[in-house]
C-alpha cells in the first residue's frame, strides 16, 4: 500500500497511528489496541484537518478487508472512525465518503460495520440542514425502513440504529421527513405488506416502530388495522407464545397513550385469552399488566373501560379465581397488582368469597395480596379486624416494616397506624430499641417516615400530633445515625419473608 501523503502540519501522535494502521493492514496483523485506545482518549484535543485525507481511507481499507475481525478484534477502529467523523460537518464527510457510497452502504447490510458507520453519520448530523436535504433527495428513510421491516435477519445493531434514526427525527423535529414516513404512499404500502405477513419477527418490528411514532403524534394518520388484531389472529399466535407476549406488551404501552377507541376490542380479546384455560401462564401474567395499566389510569375513559371490562369478564368473581387456592401465579398476580378499588367495584364480595379464605399474613405467596388491599378503603376495615389489630406485634421486623410502608401511603391506613401509640413509638420513633440487621430494613423504615412527614391529611389530628416527632426521627435517620454505625445483633424477630 502507498505511504500516506500526510503534511508536516500533522502531529507526531497522529502520524504514528496512521503509520501503525498502514503496516497492520499491509501485514494483516492485529492492531495495537492500547495505542488506538490511548489515541481515542486524546483525540478531542488534536487538530485532525491535515490528516483526514490519509486517516479515513486507511481505516476504511481495514474495515472492508476480509480479515477485518482478525486485524481489529476489539472493534476499536469503528469507535475511532466515529470519533473522527463526529468532528466533521456533513459537507466535509461527503467529500471523503461519496453520497453514492453512503446511499449504497445504507441500502445493503453486507458490510455491517460500514452500514453502522453510515447510519451513525446520518444520525449524528441530523441537526444539519444539509443532512436533511441529503436524506430527502436520496429516499434514505424509505431505504432504512424497508430493510428494517423486510429483512428478518437484519443485524440487531442495525435494527437498533434504525429505531434510533426515527427517534432522532422526532427529537430534532424534522417534520417533513416524519410526515413523509406517515403519509407517503410507498411507506403505507410497505406497512400494509408487513401487517399481512406471517413473519412474527417483522410484525414485532412494525409494532415497535408504531410505538416510536406515537411519541411524535398520538393521533397517527395510520390505518388502525396496522396495530389491531382479531380474536382469531390472537388465538393463532398461541403457537408462537414469544410473539404473543410481545403483542401484549405492545398493548400495555399503547394504553399509556390513551389510544382506546381502536384497541379496546383487542384488549377484550386478551381478557378472553386470559380466561382460556389452555393459555400458558407466562402469557396470562403479561395480560395482567394491561389490566393494571387500565386500573391505575388517570384518563377517565380508560378507568371506565377497565371497570367495564372487569365487570363483563367476571375476572374477580370467585368461580374465576378457583386456582388461587392452588397458588396459581396469574391469579395471585391479578389480586396483588390490579387497583384494589377496581377489584372491589367489580366484585364487592371479594373479601368474603376469596380473600377471607387465604392466609394473607402468614403465607409468603399470598402476602402481596394483603399489601395490595391495604389501599382499599372498603377492604381495609376487614384486614384491620382480622390481622392488624392483634397480630402485627408478633410479626418479624422485615415483614412488619413492609406492612408499615403500605400503611404510610394511604390516609385511612395512616390514621390506623398513628392511632396505635405502641406501633408508632416502638417502630417509628425509637431508633435504639429495635435492631436493624440489614440495609434494606433500614431504608424501608426511612421510606415509611418520609411518607408520613410528607403526608398532608388535613383532617387527621393523629398526623398533626405525631408529625413533629416523626420529623425528628426521620432527620436522625437521614442525617444522623447511619446503618454502618449500628452494632449488628441477632434477634429472633428478624426473619426474611
Curated annotation (Swiss-Prot):
GO terms, biological process: DNA repair
InterPro entries according to UniProt: HSM3_C, HSM3_N
Family: Belongs to the proteasome subunit S5B/HSM3 family.
Organism: Scheffersomyces stipitis (strain ATCC 58785 / CBS 6054 / NBRC 10063 / NRRL Y-11545)
Record function comment: Involved in DNA mismatch repair in slow-growing cells. Acts as a chaperone during the assembly of the 26S proteasome, specifically of the base subcomplex of the 19S regulatory complex (RC).
Pfam families for the chain: HSM3_C, HSM3_N
Protein's recorded name: DNA mismatch repair protein HSM3
Keywords: Chaperone, Cytoplasm, DNA damage, DNA repair
UniProt-annotated location(s): Cytoplasm
One GO cellular component, as annotated: cytoplasm
Amino acid at each position: 500500500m502507498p505511504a500516506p501523503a500526510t503534511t508536516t502540519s500533522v502531529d507526531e501522535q497522529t502520524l504514528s497511528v496512521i503509520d501503525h494502521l498502514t503496516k497492520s493492514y499491509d501485514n494483516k496483523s492485529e492492531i495495537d489496541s492500547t495505542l488506538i485506545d490511548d489515541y481515542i482518549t486524546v483525540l478531542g484535543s488534536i487538530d485532525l484537518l491535515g490528516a483526514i485525507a490519509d486517516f479515513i481511507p486507511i481505516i476504511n481499507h481495514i474495515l472492508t478487508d476480509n480479515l477485518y475481525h482478525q486485524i481489529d478484534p476489539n472493534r476499536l477502529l469503528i469507535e475511532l472512525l466515529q470519533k473522527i467523523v463526529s468532528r466533521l460537518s456533513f459537507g466535509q464527510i461527503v467529500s471523503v465518503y461519496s453520497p453514492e457510497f453512503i446511499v449504497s452502504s445504507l441500502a445493503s447490510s453486507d458490510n455491517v460495520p460500514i452500514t453502522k458507520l453510515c447510519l451513525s453519520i446520518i444520525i449524528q448530523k441530523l441537526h444539519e440542514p444539509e443532512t436533511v436535504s441529503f436524506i430527502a433527495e436520496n429516499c434514505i428513510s424509505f431505504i432504512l425502513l424497508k430493510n428494517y421491516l423486510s429483512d428478518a435477519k437484519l443485524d440487531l445493531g442495525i435494527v437498533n440504529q434504525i429505531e434510533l434514526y426515527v427517534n432522532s427525527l422526532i427529537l430534532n423535529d424534522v417534520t417533513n421527513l416524519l410526515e413523509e414516513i406517515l403519509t407517503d404512499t410507498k411507506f403505507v404500502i410497505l406497512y400494509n405488506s408487513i401487517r399481512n405477513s406471517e413473519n412474527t419477527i417483522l410484525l414485532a418490528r412494525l409494532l415497535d416502530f408504531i410505538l416510536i411514532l406515537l411519541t411524535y403524534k398520538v393521533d397517527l394518520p395510520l390505518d388502525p388495522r396496522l396495530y389491531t388484531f382479531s380474536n382469531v389472529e390472537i388465538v393463532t399466535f398461541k403457537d408462537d407464545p414469544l410473539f404473543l407476549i410481545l403483542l401484549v406488551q405492545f398493548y400495555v404501552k399503547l394504553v399509556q397513550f390513551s389510544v382506546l377507541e381502536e384497541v379496546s376490542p383487542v384488549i377484550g380479546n386478551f381478557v378472553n385469552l386470559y380466561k382460556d384455560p389452555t393459555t400458558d401462564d407466562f402469557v396470562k401474567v403479561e395480560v395482567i399488566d394491561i389490566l393494571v395499566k387500565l386500573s391505575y389510569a388517570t384518563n377517565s375513559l380508560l378507568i371506565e373501560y377497565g371497570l367495564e371490562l372487569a365487570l363483563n369478564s367476571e375476572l374477580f368473581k370467585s368461580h374465576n379465581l378457583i386456582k388461587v387456592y392452588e397458588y396459581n401465579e396469574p391469579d395471585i398476580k391479578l389480586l396483588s397488582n390490579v387497583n384494589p378499588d377496581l377489584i372491589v367495584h367489580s366484585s364487592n364480595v371479594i373479601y368474603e368469597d376469596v380473600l377471607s379464605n387465604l392466609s394473607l399474613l402468614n403465607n409468603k405467596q399470598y402476602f402481596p395480596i394483603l399489601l395490595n388491599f391495604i389501599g382499599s378503603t372498603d377492604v381495609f376495615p376487614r384486614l384491620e379486624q382480622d390481622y392488624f389489630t392483634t397480630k402485627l406485634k408478633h410479626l418479624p421486623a422485615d415483614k412488619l416494616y413492609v406492612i408499615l410502608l403500605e400503611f404510610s401511603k394511604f390516609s385511612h391506613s395512616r390514621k390506623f397506624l398513628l392511632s396505635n401509640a405502641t406501633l408508632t413509638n416502638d417502630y417509628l420513633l425509637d431508633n435504639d430499641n429495635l435492631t436493624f440487621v440489614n440495609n434494606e430494613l433500614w431504608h424501608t423504615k426511612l421510606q415509611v417516615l418520609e411518607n408520613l412527614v410528607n403526608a398532608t391529611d388535613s383532617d387527621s389530628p393523629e398526623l398533626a400530633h405525631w408529625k413533629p416527632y416523626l420529623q425528628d426521627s426521620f432527620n436522625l435517620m437521614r442525617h444522623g445515625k447511619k446503618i454502618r454505625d449500628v452494632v449488628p445483633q441477632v434477634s429472633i424477630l428478624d426473619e426474611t419473608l
